[in-house]
Amino acid sequence: MDLSEDQIRGLPHHELLGHFLQMREEFNEFQTSSAEIEKMMDSELDDLKTQLKKAETRVQQMTTEQIRNKDRQDDSRVQFAQVEEQLRRENSHLHEQCESQRERIRKLEQRNDVLETSERNKEYLASDLGSKLDHAIEKIAMLESELYERQVAAEEMHRLREEQLRTTERPRLIVEPLRNDPEILPDEPSPGPSKEEFKMSSEDVFMEDVQHHEDVRMEETIAKIDEVRIDDNKNIQEKSQRVSTGTGAGACINRIVKDLMTKVERLDSILSTIRVSNNSSNNNSSHLTTTRA
């Protein structure tokens, strides 16, 4: 308990001694407790010093880490700026390429439309040329058959004329010994040729001239036919070579149709010459029959 100084002086000796002993015990207890508290405080202080050192070390590490992170951030910022600039350039380049591709696509679409139109025109032209080709082939077949018939008729006519010439030459062979006979009877006419014999000989000469002229025309016609065949073979070879070189289908069809049309025209001209020659031969034969009559 707490007593003032006057109270302590007024206490008797045994109470004062007891109070002293009590104060001494309390002091000892206080020393003991203060020593323990001091030890605890020292240990806590040591712990705090250790934690402080650790915190300082951590702060230094964090500072170093912060500096490193700042440097990295600066480097990253520079790299990001470079990458951003590169991406912008690439974006602008890609945008230009996109615009050029769009323009190219637009031109290709226009060209595709033109090609489709030309393809349709070519298909129509090919169908038209195909029909013309079929018509020309049919006409060529008809003309070839007619030409073959004309050739057969011309050969038959030539054979008949040769037989006619042989039949007209037989009486002359029989009459010639009579002409060479030196004996002349007084009642008989002079050994000169009679009017009938002279007429027959002139007709024979005229027939020979006509036959020679017709033979020449026939040879010319046959030569023209051979030339047409040779030209056809050459045209076929040229067509095969042109087709093998890889020319267009429309150009090949045009050339084939042109060649066929020229062939038809040549055959028409040949047939017209044959008709003219046949008409002239018929006129000559009719003239001969009238003169003989």
UniProtKB/Swiss-Prot annotation:
Residues 36-147 form a coiled coil. GO terms for molecular function: microtubule binding. Signal peptide: none annotated. GO terms for cellular component: centrosome; kinesin complex; kinetochore; microtubule associated complex; nuclear envelope; synapse. It comes from the Eukaryota. Keywords: Coiled coil, Nucleus. Component of a dynein-regulating complex composed of at least lis-1 and nud-2. Interacts with lis-1; the interaction is direct. Interacts (via C-terminus) with unc-83; the interaction is direct, and is required for recruitment of nud-2 to the nuclear envelope. Residues 239-293 are annotated as: Required for interaction with unc-83 isoform c. Disruption phenotype: RNAi-mediated knockdown results in viable animals, but a small, but significant number of animals have nuclear migration defects in hyp7 hypodermal precursor cells. RNAi-mediated knockdown results in an abnormal distribution of GABAergic synaptic vesicles at synaptic termini of the ventral nerve cord. RNAi-mediated knockdown in combination with exposure to pentylenetetrazole, a GABA antagonist that induces seizures, results in impaired locomotion, stiffened appearance and an increased convulsion incidence as compared to wild-type animals. It comes from Caenorhabditis elegans. This is Protein nud-2. GO terms for biological process: cell migration; centrosome localization; chromosome segregation; establishment of chromosome localization; establishment of mitotic spindle orientation; microtubule nucleation; mitotic centrosome separation; nuclear migration. The lineage of its organism: Eukaryota, Metazoa, Ecdysozoa, Nematoda, Chromadorea. Part of a complex with lis-1, which is recruited to the nuclear envelope by unc-83, where, in turn, it recruits dynein to the nuclear surface and regulates nuclear migration in hypodermal precursor cells. Plays a role in GABAergic synaptic vesicle localization in the ventral nerve cord. Belongs to the nudE family.
